[in-house]
C-alpha cells in the first residue's frame, strides 16, 4: 500500500473527490503515527504506485501540497519514496 500524506483532512478529501469516478479504491485515513509522529495529518491510501503518482500529479495541478509519499513495507513499517 502507498500513503500520500496531506496536512489536513480538507486537502486529502478534496483530492480524493477528484477521483470519485475512478475504479481504484482510494481511502482517506489518519496518517499512521510511524509516518507522522505526533502531528495530526491525513493520508490517501492506495494500492498501486502508479495510482499514487497520478494522485500526486493531480495534487500539484490543484496547488495542494503533499508532505510525502510512503510505501508500507511490512505491517506498520513504512519507507519514504521519492517521486
Language-model regions, residue ranges each:
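Amphipathic, hydrophobic secondary-structure cores in small proteins
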Residues: 1, 26-46
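Helix N-cap motif at beta-to-alpha junctions
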Residues: 8-11, 46-51
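Short amphipathic alpha-helix segments
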Residues: 9-25
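Intrinsically disordered, low-complexity boundary segments flanking structured domains
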Residues: 13, 30-33, 55-58
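Generic alpha-helical hydrophobic packing signal
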Residues: 16, 39-41, 59, 63-64
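C-terminal structural segments of small proteins and small subunits
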Residues: 51-83
Amino acid at each position: 500500500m502507498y500513503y500520500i500524506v496531506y496536512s489536513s483532512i480538507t486537502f486529502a478529501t478534496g483530492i480524493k473527490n477528484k477521483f470519485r469516478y475512478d475504479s481504484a479504491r482510494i481511502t482517506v485515513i489518519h496518517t499512521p503515527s510511524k509516518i507522522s509522529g505526533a502531528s495530526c495529518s491525513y493520508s490517501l491510501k492506495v494500492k498501486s504506485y502508479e495510482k499514487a503518482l497520478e494522485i500526486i500529479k493531480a495534487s500539484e495541478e490543484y496547488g495542494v501540497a503533499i508532505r510525502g509519499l510512503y510505501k508500507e513495507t511490512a505491517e506498520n513499517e513504512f519507507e519514504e519514496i521519492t517521486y
